Amino acid sequence: MALDTPLSRAPAIAPEPKGILDPATGLPIGATDPTFLSINDELADRGFLLTTADDLITWARTGSLMWMTFGLACCAVEMMQMSMPRYDAERFGFAPRASPRQSDVMIVAGTLTNKMAPALRKVYDQMPEPRYVISMGSCANGGGYYHYSYSVVRGCDRVVPVDIYVPGCPPSAEALLYGVLLLQKKIRRTGTIER
């Protein structure tokens, strides 16, 4: 005879993910983005788009960001979880690459020590322009728990320029995915072609 406990009656599958929502509006990320709203209006009005080369390149770059991991500690586990099927970062055009020469984005996840700082800079310098950095977790953002240690760099922004900071110890995969979407929004806002 089986025991009838709340745990034995619970479904054996994970609940449905709720999606990525903007905490300020409660709407999905990108629902109020002026770029997408203007594209929808123009397509509905004429049936085709007129655009500049800069806008086309910026649009293509935001939809095909290749990221490289620089996992130094426990935050790297959440970073790996973001690329797994439950969150599926590739549906946002954010795919992993193993080489810095093929990457647009570096995710620094974990405690950066003084000995590892030159390696971080060397890998960053090998990335092609334009390149972006996401600092993930309290340790990468400012030293975290080890802030006062003699061997820890108090934030990876002292070694490489950081575009997006994702707070938490460790931040969840949803938080990192939200940071990726914010990076895409930043790229759309600033453009990629230098004049």
UniProtKB/Swiss-Prot annotation:
Keywords of this entry: 4Fe-4S, Cell inner membrane, Cell membrane, Iron, Iron-sulfur, Membrane, Metal-binding, NAD, Quinone, Translocase, Transport, Ubiquinone
Function, as annotated: NDH-1 shuttles electrons from NADH, via FMN and iron-sulfur (Fe-S) centers, to quinones in the respiratory chain. The immediate electron acceptor for the enzyme in this species is believed to be ubiquinone. Couples the redox reaction to proton translocation (for every two electrons transferred, four hydrogen ions are translocated across the cytoplasmic membrane), and thus conserves the redox energy in a proton gradient.
Main location: membrane
Protein name: NADH-quinone oxidoreductase subunit B
Catalytic activity: a quinone + NADH + 5 H(+)(in) = a quinol + NAD(+) + 4 H(+)(out)
NCBIfam families for this protein: nuoB_fam (TIGR01957), PRK06411.1 (NF005012)
Location(s), subcellular: Cell inner membrane
Known cofactor(s): [4Fe-4S] cluster
Keyword set includes Nucleus: no
SUPFAM superfamilies membership: HydA/Nqo6-like (SSF56770)
The keyword 4Fe-4S appears for this protein: yes
Enzyme Commission code: 7.1.1.-
GO BP, sorted A to Z: aerobic respiration; electron transport coupled proton transport
One Gene Ontology term of the molecular function aspect: iron ion binding
Complexes and interactors: NDH-1 is composed of 14 different subunits. Subunits NuoB, C, D, E, F, and G constitute the peripheral sector of the complex.
InterPro entries membership: NADH_UbQ_OxRdtase-like_20kDa, NADH_UQ_OxRdtase_20Kd_su
Major enzyme class: translocase
Amino acids binding [4Fe-4S] cluster: 74-75, 139, 169
Pfam families named among the record's database cross-references: Oxidored_q6 (PF01058)
Family the UniProt entry places it in: Belongs to the complex I 20 kDa subunit family.
Co-factor note (free text): Binds 1 [4Fe-4S] cluster.
Protein topology in the membrane: Peripheral membrane protein
